[in-house]
Amino acid sequence: MLDVKLLRNNFEEVKQKLQNRGEDLGEFEKFGELDKRRRTLIVETEALKSQRNEVSQEIAKLKREKQDADAKIEEMRVVGDRIKTLDIELREIDEKLDMILMSIPNIPHESTPVGESEDDNVEIRKWGEVRTFDFEPKAHWDLGTDLDILDFENAAKVTGSRFVFYKKLGARLERALINFMMDLHSNEHGYEEMLPPYMVNRASMTGTGQLPKFEEDAFLIEAEDYFLIPTAEVPVTNYHREDILKAEDLPRKYTAFSACFRSEAGSAGRDTRGLIRQHQFNKVELVQFVKPEDSYEALEKLTSNAEEVLRRLELPYRVLSMCTADLGFTAAKKYDLEVWIPSYDSYREISSCSNFESFQARRANIRFRREPGSKPEYVHTLNGSGLALGRTVAAILENYQDADGSVRIPKVLQGYMGGIEKIELPK
């Protein structure tokens, strides 16, 4: 949520930045109109209340002097009725303004590239060499089926499309990746480990920006009004909802493994095969709470933490700075990490690392004090995938496959796999 003072005092500047996002400005313009009406009502209400106070004193004086005060009393009855009417209208306008404010996205940081589509995202750097195969490589869904480590068919029978059973060494590979990522982030990168709830309430989804605008993308448990989490970002960020943190306790850095649940509304026909776009998938998340002046340095470090996973797995990747049109609702600046997937002959997103500045903190009321007794300020929040597990498995299967249909295990994972170096075709 944006600072309402920013909208009031810098309306045209904010409008231009939202235009750079490609936003429909209808709601934003409505905010300006309603806020102007609100200020007019406040001026009238305060004038009437001042008048009522003055006339009330006059009425009291008339009564003390045993003079007729009926006309003044009638005048104040009319004024009182008008104040009640104005107060009702003010409350209605405030409710509308709050709803509009919740629907306005974050303002892009000045370093975010201005663009009209994903084609305008800017490549920052690449790492690793894309492998050249001397045989026809298989897609990960075929590799997983042939190796008997992924079962999409029975998952579709048990649940439906966009689900998978991990089996045998496939399940063990997923578990190895989880442990490797959590160990790396907690032991070397300084994150505190968490295992969060997989269901959250409406206030939590609102705090991180999924609600009210993106409710159709979430899975709702209607009987309880709980949502299955789309990412561990939601419960971990809301861990500090309504908290006032101490400055000396910042930054707070958390890493959390969780299952994630997404309806993928609007994704019909996209990535229908394999692990790239599932309704349920596992992910290791990185979340930080920092002082405002530290947030952009923190974003670079967080992004590097996510990159380190790919470097140690020796998977080729690139980093993109996302343009204003591809920034997402809550971010002021965002980097995407894309890993090379041979079956797509392209890089595919495996992590997003974002600085939300105070956008989420205002919605969730997460603050800190610089000194005891000082006025609380909003923290800046950041998060990133460190990494998405299904896409990491897909990248390993495809990039580490051999001509005989087997898949080599990355060296960094072999210790987590009990020394297993290769997944071979069943005999």
Swiss-Prot record:
Q: Name one GO biological process term.
A: selenocysteine biosynthetic process
Question: Which reaction is recorded as catalysed by this protein?
Answer: tRNA(Ser) + L-serine + ATP = L-seryl-tRNA(Ser) + AMP + diphosphate + H(+); tRNA(Sec) + L-serine + ATP = L-seryl-tRNA(Sec) + AMP + diphosphate + H(+)
Keywords tagged on the record: Aminoacyl-tRNA synthetase, ATP-binding, Cytoplasm, Ligase, Nucleotide-binding, Protein biosynthesis
Q: List the disulfide bonds.
A: none
Which positions does UniProt annotate for ATP binding? R262, S263, E264, E349, I350, S351, S352
Q: Which SUPFAM superfamilies match?
A: Class II aaRS and biotin synthetases, tRNA-binding arm
Amino acids binding L-serine:
T231, A232, E233, E285, S385
Q: Which GO terms describe its cellular component?
A: cytoplasm
The family database entries (CDD domains) matched by this protein are listed as: SerRS_core (cd00770)
**Entry-linked InterPro entries:** aa-tRNA-synt_IIb, aa-tRNA-synth_II, aa-tRNA-synth_II/BPL/LPL, Ser-tRNA-ligase_type_1, Ser-tRNA-synth_1_N, SerRS_1_N_sf, SerRS_core, tRNA-bd_arm
> Which top EC class is given?
ligase
Matches recorded under PROSITE patterns:
AA_TRNA_LIGASE_II
Question: NAD among the record's keywords?
Answer: no
What's the record's remark on domains? Consists of two distinct domains, a catalytic core and a N-terminal extension that is involved in tRNA binding.
Entry protein name: Serine--tRNA ligase
Source species of the chain: Listeria welshimeri serovar 6b (strain ATCC 35897 / DSM 20650 / CCUG 15529 / CIP 8149 / NCTC 11857 / SLCC 5334 / V8)
